Every structure is written in C-alpha cells, then in structure tokens.
C-alpha cells in the first residue's frame, strides 16, 4: 500500500525499502501486542493448552495449562504488515507470504491434532508432517527456479566466487534447506523465549544480506551476488521481527503463551527461505547455530541409542539436558541467546571477509 502511495502521489519517502521495513516492524509489533492478550484469553477459554510430554523434565509440568498456537497471531500480523508495506508485485515477497501462510497452516493442523483434536503431544504423524513440509518447500523452490528470480550457483561463506552451478538440482537442495530450518526451529522451541530471540537475530542478519544483495552498488562493493528484487524481502523479515518481538512480550519467562508448531514451523521455514534467497544456505549453519546444535543433539541421541544402546545426553534436545543437570531455565535461555548473538555477529563478518 505505502509503495503505491509513492507511485500515485509521488510521496518519495515510501519508495525506500528501509522506511517501509521500519513501518512494517511497528505495525506488526503493535498489532501483535494488541491481539495476543485477546488470543490468550480465547485459548484459555477453549482449553487450547500445550500437552506436556510425560517424560519431559518435571519443571515443565507446571506449564501444562499454558495456551499455545501463538504463532497464528504473530504470523497473521506479519502478513498484514507485509501486505500494507511491501510491493506485492515482487516475486520474493509473494514467495515469502506463501511460505509463512502454508507452513503456519501446517503447524496449525499439527497443533489442532495435539490440543483440540486427539489430545496427545505427538500431533500429526512424523511422516505426514514431513511430507507436507517437503511439498510446500518444493513448491517454493520450484517457483524460484522457474521464475528465474534466483540463479542456481552454489556459494560458500567467506568466498566471493560461486563454487559450481547446481542447475535443476538446486530445487532439491533449496527444498532440503527450507525443511531442515523449519524442523530445527521447531525442535528448539522448548523453553520460554528460546526459539524467538535466536530467530530474531537470524532474521536481522539475513535481512542485512538481503538488503545488500538487492542493492547494485553495495553488492558490488562487498562482492556479494547481485539478486534483483531480493531487497524487498527485508520488509517481510522486518514485519516478522516486529511480530516476534510482540510475541516475546508474552512468551518471556514465565510464558503466558507458546508459539506452537504454527509459529515454529513457519518461522524456521522462512529463515531457511531467506538463506536460499540470499545464497547463504551454508552460512545458515552459523546464522542459526543454536538451531543446528539443538537438531544435532537429537540426531546424535537417536543414532547413539539405536547403534550403541547408549544415550549421549540426559535428554534431547540439548536444552533439556541442561535442565536435568540442574541449570535454571532462565540461565539456559539467556546463555543460548548470547551464543546466538555471537554466532550472528560472526556470520556478518562474511560481508567483508571475501
């Protein structure tokens, strides 16, 4: 809307991505802060609380009546802010909206199965969830490939030249990145605010890369790939950051609401999408370091138990390991936030080390 005000009335300030990103941030934040208490009241009335896994640490049992599916609210507000502030004729914006909406709906279906439906903590079967994740991600990747909006060259962090051209195999690689990121954030969402803040850091870093890659002068100076149109996705990322900060107001310890799969699956998928859109698929390992560590802890735990019949951690994901060791929840959360911040600062050095 704001961009078209610029086109119609020649109100120049609205042509700038940074201005519209800032407006999107505040719209999403204010809307989330306004709507979330109403959603919490509704969720409590409907008993839409997160079922607690019976083997979870005992400290989690007191969270049994905490409402979930907060992701429905903050993704909704991010989408509204995007529609108001972004250019809707931009392929990356349209793909972003598709990513957020579809993964949120998938997460909602999973949450519904857990809470309002079957009343079990498992929700959708792992096979069903994974199938739909791959389907949505494949459609996203295929759109990027067919539209020619994104080249298929493979880049490594801190190296300015592409390594090789993936050609049509880029579709499958991009699909895998989006699904992996979606599940990684989902696994991390186990403590109050643990997934939200690292997600904000990741989106900030990816937003910086998107803005530079979409800018002809900056991308040339910093030796980043020039990706026409990707800068507009900064508006979407900014809207999602604003909505996540509004959500964090109610999700910080002790949480009044959880994001649920409707939030974690969509936020993770969008982080993966932004990594793909900015050619930072491998750098995502550093940008989303906390998510990677959480996921690896689960993979190692399952693999070790199946092969050696022994567990590496007291419980996986790894944040539960520290809980059982006696760390206070707040201490785990803040330390993980610090690690996430440092990892993103390191990732940003890739702007100069090329």
From Swiss-Prot:
InterPro entries assigned: Glycosyl_transferase_4, PNAcMuramoyl-5peptid_Trfase, PNAcMuramoyl-5peptid_Trfase_CS
Major location (coarse): membrane
Keyword Transferase found: yes
Pathway: Cell wall biogenesis; peptidoglycan biosynthesis
Residues annotated as transmembrane: 23-43, 66-86, 88-108, 130-150, 168-188, 193-213, 230-250, 257-277, 282-302, 331-351
GO cellular component: plasma membrane
Single annotated GO MF: phospho-N-acetylmuramoyl-pentapeptide-transferase activity
Keyword Magnesium among UniProt keywords: yes
Signal peptide residues on this chain, from the entry's feature table: none
Subcellular location: Cell inner membrane
Broadest EC class assigned to this enzyme: transferase
Protein EC: 2.7.8.13
Top-rank taxon: Bacteria
The protein's role, per its UniProt record: Catalyzes the initial step of the lipid cycle reactions in the biosynthesis of the cell wall peptidoglycan: transfers peptidoglycan precursor phospho-MurNAc-pentapeptide from UDP-MurNAc-pentapeptide onto the lipid carrier undecaprenyl phosphate, yielding undecaprenyl-pyrophosphoryl-MurNAc-pentapeptide, known as lipid I.
Protein name, per record: Phospho-N-acetylmuramoyl-pentapeptide-transferase
Species of the source: Campylobacter concisus (strain 13826)
Protein's gene: mraY
């Amino acid at each position: 809307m704001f961009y078209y005000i610029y086109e119609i009335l020649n109100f120049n300030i609205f042509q700038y991505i940074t201005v519209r990103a800032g407006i999107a941030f505040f719209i999403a934040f204010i809307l989330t802060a306004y709507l979330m208490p109403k959603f919490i009241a509704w969720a409590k009335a409907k008993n839409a609380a997160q079922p607690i896994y019976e083997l979870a640490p005992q400290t989690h049992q007191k969270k049994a009546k905490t409402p979930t599916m907060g992701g429905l609210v903050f993704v909704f507000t991010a989408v509204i802010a995007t529609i108001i502030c972004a250019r809707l004729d931009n392929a990356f914006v349209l793909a972003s909206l598709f990513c957020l909406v579809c993964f949120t709906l998938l997460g909602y279906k999973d949450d519904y199965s857990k809470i309002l439906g079957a009343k079990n903590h498992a929700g959708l079967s792992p096979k069903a969830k994974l199938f739909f994740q791959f389907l949505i991600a494949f459609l996203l990747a295929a759109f990027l490939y067919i539209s020619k909006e994104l080249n298929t060259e493979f880049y490594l962090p801190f190296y300015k030249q592409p390594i090789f051209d993936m050609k049509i195999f880029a579709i499958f690689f991009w699909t895998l990145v989006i699904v992996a990121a979606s599940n990684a954030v989902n696994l991390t969402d186990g403590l109050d605010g643990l997934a939200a803040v690292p997600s904000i850091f990741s989106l900030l870093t990816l937003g910086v890369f998107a803005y530079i890659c979409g800018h002809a002068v900056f991308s040339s100076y910093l030796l980043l790939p020039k990706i026409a149109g990707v800068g507009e996705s900064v508006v979407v990322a900014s809207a999602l950051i604003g909505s996540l900060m509004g959500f964090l107001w109610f999700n910080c310890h002790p949480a009044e609401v959880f994001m649920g799969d409707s939030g974690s699956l969509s936020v993770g998928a969008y982080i993966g999408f932004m990594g793909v859109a900015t050619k930072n698929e491998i750098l995502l390992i550093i940008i989303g370091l906390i998510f990677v560590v959480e996921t690896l802890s689960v993979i190692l735990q399952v693999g070790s138990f199946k092969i050696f019949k022994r567990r590496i951690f007291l419980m996986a994901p790894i944040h539960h390991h520290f809980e059982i060791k006696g760390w206070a929840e707040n201490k785990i959360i803040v330390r993980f936030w610090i690690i996430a911040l440092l990892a993103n600062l390191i990732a940003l050095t890739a702007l100069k080390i090329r």
